[in-house]
Each structure stands twice: as structure tokens, then as C-alpha cells.
Amino acid sequence: MDRPLDERTVLQMQLSSGLLYAGRQWQRLADSRLGSYGISTACTMPLLMIGRSGGGIRQVALAQQLGMEGPSLVRLLDKLCASDLVRRESDASDRRANLLWLTEAGHALVQELEDQLIDLRQDVFGALSMDELHAVLKAWRLLAEAADRIT
């Protein structure tokens, strides 16, 4: 590159270049922490997101939150339902839509997973100040807003 880069541009390059790597690192750490629970990595996020929603989340909304295509999510939900962790119900306001709920076993597992993730977050991010945490979240929010504008 012939163009001289100032410090701000270099830092922005490091930030954008590090996003994918950091996501992979986090996934590896979470997989390591949650691996003993007998649930696949792929099933963990849908299960957690259903729990965090309070239940009754539409399948389409969950797919959007996870950035997944419907058919890929359906396969994971089939596994979670077969494991008696999630149940599907028809949405009374739109029979074409499914609502997703945790079963009793699903609630118990999600609580254990969330407890483990709270500890992991403290281990990884505990040295960050509140201002630093807010700065990271602001960067992610700006990225999401730019993606919404562009795509």
C-alpha cells in the first residue's frame, strides 16, 4: 500500500481484522467450557437464545437473531426437541409460525450453561473497566448499524 497510514487507521485495521479471529477464539473457549454438557456446539446458541428470550420466540425470529437460514435451524431444533430440551407450539395468531419454549430439562440446562458462561466472561473480560466494555459494545453497535444500512 502506497498510502501512509496514521495511527487511527492502523488501529481501525487491527480492530476489523481481529473481529473474526476474536469470534473464533471466543467460540473455542466457550466450547471448551461447555463441552462436558453433552450438547453440540451448534445446538448451544439456539438453546441459549430461546432461554434468553423468555420463551415463546418465533422460529423465524430466532433464525434472524442467529444469522441462520431456516432449514439449518430446523435441523438443530429437531435435535433439541428430540432431546426434550425444547418444544414447538403453533402460534395462535399465525398457524404457519412456530413458537419455541424450553422444557423443564431445557431450563435446567440453560441455567447451568449460563452460569458457566458468566464465569468464563469474568475470566476473559474481568480486567476490562466499565468504560472499556462500553467502548467495545459501541464498536459492535456501529458495525451492526453500518451492516443494516449497507445490506
Predicted regions: what they are:
Residues 63:
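The alpha-helix within a helix-turn-helix
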Residues 53-58:
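Short capping segments at the starts of secondary-structure elements
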Residues 60, 78-138, 145:
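Charged, amphipathic alpha-helical coiled-coil/dimerization segments
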Residues 1-37:
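N-terminal leader segment of winged-helix/HTH proteins
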Residues 1-7, 130-151:
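C-terminal regulatory/oligomerization modules of transcriptional regulators
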Residues 46-47:
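Short alpha-helical "packing" element that flanks the helix-turn-helix/winged-helix DNA-binding module
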Residues 69:
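Helix-turn-helix DNA-binding motif, specifically the short coil turn and the N-cap/start of the second
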